[in-house]
Every structure is written in structure tokens, then in C-alpha cells.
Amino acid sequence: MAVIVRPTPSPTPYPAVIGSFLRARRMVQRNMLVYRHSWIVIFSGFFEPLFYLLGIGYGLGTFVGDITMAGGYVVPYAVFVAPALLAQSTMNGAISETIFNVFFKLNFEKIYDAVLATPLGVGDIALGELMWAMIRATIYAVAFIAVMLVMGLLISPWAVLALPATLFCSLAFCAAGLATTTYLRTVQDFDLPFGLVIMPMFLFSGTFFPISIYPEWLQFLVQLTPLYHAVELLRALTTGVVEPTILAHIGYLAAFGSVAMVLARRRLAAKLVK
């Protein structure tokens, strides 16, 4: 744990918020340098949802046929599943960076102790890691949307907003992952968020079938999860079934991400600064 004694900061020509982003940018640049010779690793989590799309969306979709969505809209099963797997792809990018990589930087490599010896503070570290994780999640999203476009799974003009919408998804997942990793003590603890939270969310958040088939109490629990709101938001845009409720999904993801980010910063400060 680093013991930090900071001098009185010198005047800065930038407003506080802009100054924080400029400092956090250094963390992003550092991560880019680290990955410059192993960039293929960034795409590792992209392939899992792609294989699900090919295996389940098309393989199982041949037997399932069409799916009736809210409002009576009928779409092919692959069209129904694809935006949910886009949400999962975004989540994979966020979680891979914020849980795995941040955990090792924090507990083994002691990267942040070294960073705190520079003008950067804990808030700059948290913001920088959030920005980098969102970049990685966005790369996943861009690649997956390109696959959906080639496969003819974007059936609405609203789909042009799918990529901007993934930014709200990545904010929620990146901030949540960053906060979660501060509670993990050993490598074995990875099983807890993945086995008890991430996998159940993936299976039950309307990924493969509408949540209307669940009992009401389970529907309520599912609607509390960020992945459900990400799936519903992206599915509405890519299928054209756009209703005012998408604003609620956006609001939820933005609020969830903001609260999780505040928690992540406080937890990092408690672990790094004495």
C-alpha cells in the first residue's frame, strides 16, 4: 500500500474535469503501449459470442423458427439473438479488462503504486482504466456489428444507433467490473463474479428467449440486471421495435455505471492510499 504525500498542486489552465481526463489519458496511452505487440489478445473475448451466434442463432434457429417480440413483431431467431450477443460481446470486453487485468495490476504487478508517484491520483487511475476498458469493449462491439451487417441481421435503419448505444452498455459493465475487482483477494475469487453473476445474467437476461416466459418474480430480478437493459436497448435498435422504454434502458445503464464508478474510485482509494 503506497503512502502518498502530495505537494500543493500548481495552478492549471484547464478546468478540473478536463484536467482529470487529460491525466487519465496517460493511463490509456500506457495500456496501448503494453498491447502494441499483443493486440490479438484484445479480440480474444469477441469470438465466444460469435460462436454462439453461429451455433445457436443459426443452428438452433433452424428448429426454433421465428420469435414473436413485444407488440407482436415477428423476427427470425438469429435476428432476435444477435443483439443480445452484441451486448454480451461488449460485456466480455469490459470484464476481461477490468476484472482480470486490473486485478493483476493492483495485486501483483503493483502498477498503480508506481503511477501514484507521478502527478496522477487515484481518480485519474480509475478514470483511465475505465476509458481503456470502454475502448476495448467498443472494439468488440464494432467487430460484432460488422459481422451482423455482413450476415444481414441489422434489419432496421435504427441500427445506425447501435454502436453509440453500446457506449452506455460498456460504461455500466466497465464500471461494475472495476468496482468488483477491488473486492477480489485471490485468483480463486474469480469464480464468484463469473459463476454467481455473469453466467446467470448471460443465460437469463433475455439472451436466447423473451423473459415473458419466466414467473413474475424472476422477471423482476432479471430487470434489475444491467445486461437485461443492454439487451433490450440493442434489440430495439437492431430490429426497429423502438418504443419510449428505450430511454429507461439508457437511463438505467448510465445511472448504474455512474454509481459503480463512484464505488470503484472509493474502493481503489481505500486500497492504494494510506
Predicted regions and their residues:
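Short alpha-helical transmembrane interface motifs in multi-pass membrane proteins
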Residues: P11-Y14, I40-V41, L53, F80-A84, ...
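Membrane-interfacial helix-loop-helix junctions in multi-pass membrane proteins
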Residues: V34, F202-V259
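Alpha-helical transmembrane segments and their short interhelical loops
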Residues: V122-F194, V241-R265
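Junction motif at the cytosolic side of a transmembrane helix
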Residues: A2-T8, F63, T238-V241, G251-K274
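Pore- or pathway-lining transmembrane helices of multi-pass membrane proteins that form conduits
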Residues: F43-S44, T186-S205
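Hydrophobic alpha-helical transmembrane segments of multi-pass membrane transport proteins
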Residues: F51-I56, P76-V150, G177, L196, ...
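Membrane-interface helix starts
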Residues: Q29-E48, L247, V273-K274
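Short, membrane-interfacial amphipathic segments enriched in basic
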Residues: I4-V28, W217-Y228
